[in-house]
């Protein structure tokens, strides 16, 4: 819980800094943070090192500085990450990046979602479904598609914290419950 609060505060601070400069800087910061978070995801030993109190802030700062040099991030993100190192907050980079992405999407009027189907959809069908959902939402939609044969048929749509389960599996579950209750 505390980590989430810390991550949100730092993400909002970086976002406010980028917002003063314009949308291009907001996106640059987001891309740089995403690259850094992706690198940390592939190297979990770095995250463990950032969380380990045995390493001094200077040692952590040196490691993150070398990593940032390799990633060629913008100076603002570099200074931001070095500040995180000084304040012993490097362990929150991935959470900061995730929340920053949410803020950036809100600024651009984009909502993210995922559509789960029982079979793979053709590209034309994907585009049509996405266009219909965008029309209903009135906003741009970044929609990921995945396949889960366990839903048997229909779709499960996840957008933000909402889930619309129109799968055959869910319908059969409702029918089963109704039969058990004698309705």
UniProtKB/Swiss-Prot annotation:
GO molecular function: proton-transporting ATP synthase activity, rotational mechanism
Subunit record text: F-type ATPases have 2 components, F(1) - the catalytic core - and F(0) - the membrane proton channel. F(1) has five subunits: alpha(3), beta(3), gamma(1), delta(1), epsilon(1). F(0) has three main subunits: a(1), b(2) and c(10-14). The alpha and beta chains form an alternating ring which encloses part of the gamma chain. F(1) is attached to F(0) by a central stalk formed by the gamma and epsilon chains, while a peripheral stalk is formed by the delta and b chains.
NCBIfam families associated with the record: ATP_synt_delta
PANTHER family assigned: ATP SYNTHASE DELTA CHAIN
Family note: Belongs to the ATPase delta chain family.
Subcellular localization(s) per the UniProt record: Cell inner membrane
Function noted in UniProt: F(1)F(0) ATP synthase produces ATP from ADP in the presence of a proton or sodium gradient. F-type ATPases consist of two structural domains, F(1) containing the extramembraneous catalytic core and F(0) containing the membrane proton channel, linked together by a central stalk and a peripheral stalk. During catalysis, ATP synthesis in the catalytic domain of F(1) is coupled via a rotary mechanism of the central stalk subunits to proton translocation.
UniProt name for this protein: ATP synthase subunit delta
UniProt entry tagged with the keyword Nucleotide-binding: no
Domain of life: Bacteria
Signal sequence, renumbered to the chain: none
Swiss-Prot/TrEMBL keywords: ATP synthesis, Cell inner membrane, Cell membrane, CF(1), Hydrogen ion transport, Ion transport, Membrane, Transport
Gene source species: Nitratidesulfovibrio vulgaris (strain ATCC 29579 / DSM 644 / CCUG 34227 / NCIMB 8303 / VKM B-1760 / Hildenborough)
Primary localization class, coarse: membrane
Membrane topology: Peripheral membrane protein
């Amino acid at each position: 819980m505390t980590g989430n609060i810390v991550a949100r505060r730092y993400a909002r601070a970086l976002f406010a800094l980028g917002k003063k400069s314009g949308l291009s800087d907001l996106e640059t910061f987001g891309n740089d943070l995403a690259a850094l978070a992706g690198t940390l995801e592939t190297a979990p030993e770095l995250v463990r090192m950032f969380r380990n109190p045995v390493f001094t802030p200077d040692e952590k700062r040196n490691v993150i500085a070398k990593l940032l040099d390799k990633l060629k991030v913008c100076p603002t993100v570099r200074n931001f990450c070095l500040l995180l190192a000084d304040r012993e907050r490097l362990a929150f980079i991935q959470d900061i990046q995730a929340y920053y992405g949410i803020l950036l999407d809100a600024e651009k009027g984009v909502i993210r979602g995922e559509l789960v189907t029982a079979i793979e959809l053709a590209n034309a069908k994907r585009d049509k479904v996405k266009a219909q959902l965008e029309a209903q939402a009135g906003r741009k939609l970044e929609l990921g598609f995945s396949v889960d044969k366990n839903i048997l048929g229909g779709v499960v749509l996840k957008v933000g914290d909402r889930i619309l389960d129109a799968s055959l599996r869910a319908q059969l579950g409702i029918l089963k419950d109704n039969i058990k209750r004698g309705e």
